[in-house]
């Protein structure tokens, strides 16, 4: 499988502060790769280095088998799309007019604009001026712009952070479809549920360092344990870990016919993040 992104021993410092520490990973063609961590962990810094907006302090970063800084060259820009918190939209014109302007840069037909608007569920609102939009709608417009030219590689920095559940699910479905059509996706998020829904593989980033990397199911198997929820006849619920001393108590409840129901609970990706890093994902 072709490697789209290859990062080796990446370092990034801002004056006396080291934001990224010895980060290495690679992303294969067709993956949805989640870069997960709390605010301030280095996610946005990494995405800016990968797209050539920032220069690394050390290490090697290659995208499409070229130095990442080459993505800032006009010839490379048609190969990737990016969504960040900086919209760069023209606020005094409509959603549709913004996308039509960008479509001209890629020599695209007007139908590509219609398709992108439907992708983000904004076709009916296409005539609205950007300066009248909510934060969530602006985020959807910038996502439409990022996928307008059906890029080979899509960088998404917290893509659903300002969206309601309905539009979030709509975007999830669209991203899966885009991925099925061949787009590789690099996704940063602090939403572990989002990562579980979308990502083939994830990396846990904590204080600028990757603490674990792998498929969500593999990370759960490696670091997590299922628990049992025991519901008693008196209405109480008890959580019991596998191999814990509480198992003896559970068998006593069962022998005394005190148990109404027992269910198995799989750890969430958020639980695994806490297990690996020792901190909550905030």
Write out the residue ranges for each language-model feature:
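Helix-to-loop junction immediately C-terminal to a conserved catalytic motif
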Residues: 51
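Catalytic Walker B motif of ABC-type/P-loop ATPase nucleotide-binding domains
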Residues: 154-157
């Amino acid at each position: 499988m072709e490697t789209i992104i290859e990062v080796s021993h990446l370092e990034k410092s801002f004056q006396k502060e080291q934001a990224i520490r010895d980060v290495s990973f690679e992303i294969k063609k067709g993956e949805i790769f989640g870069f997960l961590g709390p605010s301030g962990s280095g996610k946005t810094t990494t995405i800016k280095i990968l797209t050539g907006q920032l220069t690394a302090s050390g290490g090697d970063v290659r995208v499409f088998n070229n130095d990442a800084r080459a993505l800032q060259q006009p010839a490379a820009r048609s190969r990737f799309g990016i969504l960040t918190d900086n919209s760069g939209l023209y606020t005094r014109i409509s959603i549709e007019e913004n996308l039509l302007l960008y479509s001209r840069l890629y020599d695209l037909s007007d139908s590509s604009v219609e398709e992108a608007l439907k992708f983000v569920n904004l076709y009916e609102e296409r005539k609205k001026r950007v300066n009248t939009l909510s934060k969530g709608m602006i985020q959807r417009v910038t996502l439409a712009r990022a996928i307008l030219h059906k890029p080979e590689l899509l960088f998404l920095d917290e893509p659903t952070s300002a969206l309601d559940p309905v539009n979030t699910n709509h975007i999830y479905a669209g991203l899966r479809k885009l991925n099925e059509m061949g787009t590789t996706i690099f996704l940063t998020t602090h939403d572990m549920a989002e990562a579980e829904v979308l990502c083939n593989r994830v990396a846990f980033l904590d204080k600028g360092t990757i603490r674990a990397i792998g498929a969500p199911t593999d990370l759960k198997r490696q670091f997590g344990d299922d628990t049992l929820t025991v519901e008693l006849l008196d209405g109480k619920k008890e959580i019991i870990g596998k191999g814990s001393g509480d198992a003896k108590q559970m068998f006593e409840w069962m022998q005394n016919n005190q148990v109404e129901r027992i269910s198995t609970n799989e750890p969430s990706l958020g639980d695994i993040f806490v297990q690996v890093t020792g901190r909550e994902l905030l």
